[in-house]
């Protein structure tokens, strides 16, 4: 660029500064760095960081289920979920069936009552201990130690994820985007969608956003062969694709118009995932229109 401005072979700091300034001023498409750009970058970093942390926590929870199946397999049928504060408190102190079987009933009752905020009482403690005494679980100190450490790591991740979500909430409250007026979209899901899309002015149409998320149908044609059942491309931002699909599930649950639209596609004989992809495309069109106009969501009557 510098050589195109002059035939003279001059290289000084003053000339360089003038050249850089001229190049920047000549770019008509260049936009100044705004608060919106800053918020988008911050949101993208935070939401992707949270995504990775949640994924890491999910793996640890699978490890807990595996270890409980070895140490006290009957426990899973006694509680709504293994991943509850009361169950984690129990397994932290008594990680195996043999530990629970030999525990004092008073101590067991106090632990369960305190960790469940009074939900579990003496009868539950007695039930757990009796199940532990007749359990087929193995007594393996190494696995018990692994279970305690895994639960500790999950608790640490819970605290980290909560801290990340608080930072996300602060930024979202400053932006106050229209997307949050759609029933079923929380600040976490809305933040990830906004962060991954970024500036909506970069996209000429909602279809461009769908292509960016890898949600457009693939095309294959060779001679007389034409694909009748086009598969999704699944390219682009996997974070955006994941966020849009999860958001669509919740919106279809909470918004009557989306719920009926999903039911209509299912009635046409479409597979659930195919019907959900149609609802996701409809959601993207609505989000695009809302963000471009700045208007809140108006439910269909």
Where do the model's predicted regions map?
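A detector of single, family-specific signature residues
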Residues: 1-301
């Amino acid at each position: 660029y510098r050589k195109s401005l002059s035939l003279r072979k001059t290289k000084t700091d003053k000339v360089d500064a003038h050249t850089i300034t001229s190049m920047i001023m000549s770019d008509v498409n260049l936009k100044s760095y705004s608060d919106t750009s800053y918020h988008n970058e911050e949101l993208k970093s935070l939401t992707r960081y949270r995504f990775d942390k949640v994924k890491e926590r999910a793996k640890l929870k699978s490890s807990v289920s595996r270890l409980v199946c070895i140490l006290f397999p009957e426990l899973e049928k006694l509680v709504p979920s293994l991943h509850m504060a009361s169950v984690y408190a129990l397994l932290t102190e008594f990680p195996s069936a043999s530990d629970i079987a030999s525990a004092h009933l008073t101590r067991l009752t106090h632990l369960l009552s305190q960790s469940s905020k009074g939900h579990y009482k003496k009868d539950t403690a007695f039930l757990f201990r009796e199940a532990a005494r007749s359990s087929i679980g193995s007594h393996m100190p190494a696995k018990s130690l692994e279970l305690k450490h895994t639960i500790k790591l999950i608790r640490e991740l819970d605290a980290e994820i909560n801290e990340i979500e608080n930072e996300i909430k602060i930024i979202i409250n400053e932006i106050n985007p229209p997307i949050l007026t759609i029933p079923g979209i929380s600040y976490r899901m809305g933040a990830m969608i906004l962060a991954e899309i970024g500036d909506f002015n970069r996209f000429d149409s909602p279809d461009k956003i769908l292509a960016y998320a890898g949600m457009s149908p693939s095309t294959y044609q060779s001679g007389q062969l034409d694909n009748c059942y086009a598969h999704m491309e699944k390219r682009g931002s996997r974070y955006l694709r994941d966020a849009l699909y999860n958001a669509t599930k919740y919106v279809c649950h909470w918004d009557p118009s989306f719920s009926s639209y999903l039911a209509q596609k299912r009635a046409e004989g479409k597979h659930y995932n195919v019907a959900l992809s149609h609802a996701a495309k409809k959601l993207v069109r609505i989000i695009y229109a809302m963000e471009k106009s700045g208007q809140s969501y108006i439910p269909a009557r």
